[in-house]
């Protein structure tokens, strides 16, 4: 409850958010915050930790109806990944670097995204897990606000993923 109420406040006020604002948003007394957390920094750290959890993204990817055309599945998957990239970027931009998580290694491949590619294996020239890894990397790089001056639509990302930039089919 406290963590969920704090996220929109962090996006609006950053670390300058007050415990009073958090309490008001959560509908609790200010002292209640400090029975659950030792200080405001601990609340912010909990918000960041929850935001970094990939469960919501995995659920969104798993909810994609795999019986629809491959391109529609890709568009839906890309849109979900793009939302996550932007949401995480906004949060990380609103808090100081001391709240940025220390990551020990690469993020595991999404099981739901791999399943999407396994379902459409006949359209792939690579293993489903590799396709999942490549789509995630391409989507992230074309979505991150610091790497692009304008958003790239899910359809454009999907076209680039599927067909590349070559005008004719390549024979490498």
Predicted regions and their residues:
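Helix-turn-helix
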Residues: 1, 5, 9-42, 46
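Solvent-exposed, amphipathic alpha-helical segments
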Residues: 5-12, 58, 134-145
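Amphipathic alpha-helical linker/stalk segments
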Residues: 48-76
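Short linear capping/connector segments at secondary-structure termini
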Residues: 59-63, 91-100
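Amphipathic alpha-helical packing segments from all-alpha helical-bundle domains
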Residues: 72, 76, 83-87, 97-125, ...
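Short alpha-helical scaffolding segments that buttress acidic/His motifs in well-ordered protein cores
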Residues: 94-96, 135-139, 161
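C-terminal alpha-helix
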Residues: 160-168
